[in-house]
């Protein structure tokens, strides 16, 4: 799919230059040039997908939600949650239960580990956020109700949603169950990473590279251009700092979230304590009411972790059964005496156990705080990194800070090196940076742009703000896949493929109508239309008018009912169903309906047509009837007479008898044209030409047509020419067609007798075959007929226009011209002349119907009409 950027207007909007169907709209309802309340809305081809629905950790209540009023949630087709962190998932319950999302048909998807952890994490979130807060977003029951509606998916599972929307989840590292989503809408691929890590740690795999190239990459920019410390170095610094604080008799506070980096640090501390017996007397506490439940979830999804963890588990060594770590459900059971290590949630220390312990331990200089993850601006974790002398307690009191503060990042977010390498491997044409503060995002954009410019790559990088839609234009390349009978023989270059085009979920398939049921399960139907017309004229009069309008007719008798029938243009049947009634029948289609309408209009005007009145006028004889008295046998006799009359009418409708009145030929019928041509041919002086009356009439018509355009036309008689090499390439094409059509006419339809149709196009050869190359450079050399042709005489026309001239062999439809441009012009006019000369039945071919209401035929085409028996099963037998 070829992308292009829609230029932005001065007001920040998009100057739309193409159809809205081909535009991808990306709107951030959160995490646009900020960290927190991640919520990305994608709109393309009538589909709406929302990626993540988090809250902002620096705010509470409604203020923490994304800008949800900017979207009609009933139109959302799917909500995809990348992982269970609050800034990516905590607003989900509010959206599902308190917006019009429930009025739509959208569903929510996340991985199995994410759904399992999400329930426990959200229970803790509800408990903490609702404690002493009147601005509650939702309660426990609403959270559980929404949780039951979430659909869990596996990694690498291809999930299809009706309407051409599908997605696949890939490992993202970061935390247990975290994934990135590769979304495909009508062929457009979008990779939304969420939070991801390209470094394999003690228990998680690194983020995957999807096997297919996306058109758009939406990725995080949390750390901008910063570079992480090597893992072994920061692990050593982390354990050394903890050891140092313990040696000085202090307590270590590690603010973490219940799940995520906490498990990585627990594995590290348990391993370090095992290697240092002198620390066995110092307890490590994991302060969380959900700790035990969360650890059970980790043990359940061991198979999603890295090889190191799976290998230990296969040796019956469960890495999450810690030997030196104790769970602490609440501070009420905590004896705050002596050195210890306390891991407490939440990580931003806005409330909860971590905030309470911070306020309690901050005044003691022996204690130490180690911030191990990313801190959002506006939170206590971010503020205390500035090492203020005082901190503000939850109740507003000022608390002196004397404890040490260290920042050792174990954040499972990519740094610049990992992110830039990942972007290079993805190779997307558009990169959208999200989930990053404005300063970090701007630095990352500049650094990436410099890299792409140095390589000469035309990659577009975007940094949208919240509620400012980004519009990208994509030129969709629509292709249709041929299946079934059509695909049995691959077409050559330039061939026209004729079939049904099926569109489903933005995918196109072309197939033969006969294969429709097999490949789609759709049933087919044919609409046969019948129209009865009351008409008080003879059958011969009807035929006379139809011949004058449509030319050649196919006449016979209906095989089922024995009714004499006329078939017009191979598509519409006119039957004499009764003495004064006609039945018009046809298979419904756009072209056939048009022909049937014209036939019905013609039939309705026959009664009052002046030609009909003139031909049916005759002397009137008035008879006097003698009246007799009725006697009992008269009624029976009259009844017998009525039956006899009805029988006679029925026989007249069924028996193709000749008319008593000898109607003259219609002046515009094919028979009249041939007759007139024969008269003219007999009067012709050239004995070699007059024997073909039809060719003579065609030549006269073409001469008049050309004379009206060029003014100077000569009639010639030329002998048959010896065919040169290049003329031989074109003339046989006409001869082959004519012979094929002649074979059709000789074989015929068993139910019909038809006339030989005339070709409707001309075959041309160029002037370069008429003269040596040196003469071609001169303007309009004369054409020598004697030097070109010899043999039997036949009709020809010579056309002049200034210095240019051309000779037209009327019989073989070959054009010889002094220049290519003049030859093309004459060819076009000759084609028009032939079409105007040929009757409607011969000039227009109505193709066979597809036999399905899904495809009502096609428009008529200018072509030679084929034999009826090859196009549609006939019910007619030859008329005697």
From Swiss-Prot:
Q: Where does Zn(2+) 1 bind?
A: 83, 85, 174, 195
Class of this enzyme: hydrolase
Q: Where does it reside?
A: Nucleus
- Residues in a coiled coil are none
Listed under GO cellular component are: mRNA cleavage and polyadenylation specificity factor complex
The record's Gene3D superfamilies line, in alphabetical order, gives: 3.40.50.10890, Ribonuclease Z/Hydroxyacylglutathione hydrolase-like
According to the record, the residues making up region (Disordered) are: 618-666, 729-783
GO biological process annotation, one example: mRNA 3'-end processing by stem-loop binding and cleavage
Stated EC number for the protein is 3.1.27.-
> What keywords is this UniProt entry annotated with?
Endonuclease, Hydrolase, Metal-binding, mRNA processing, Nuclease, Nucleus, Zinc
InterPro entries the UniProt entry points to = Beta_Casp, CPSF73-100_C, MBL, Metallo-B-lactamas, RibonucZ/Hydroxyglut_hydro, RMMBL
Biased composition range(s): Basic residues: 618-631
Q: Active site located where?
A: 413
Q: What does this protein do?
A: Component of the cleavage factor I (CF I) involved in pre-mRNA 3'-end processing.
Q: Which PANTHER family match?
A: CLEAVAGE AND POLYADENYLATION SPECIFICITY FACTOR FAMILY MEMBER, CLEAVAGE AND POLYADENYLATION SPECIFICITY FACTOR SUBUNIT 3
Q: What is this protein called?
A: Endoribonuclease YSH1
Query: Could you tell me which species this protein originates from?
Result: Mycosarcoma maydis
Q: What is the lineage of its organism?
A: Eukaryota, Fungi, Dikarya, Basidiomycota, Ustilaginomycotina
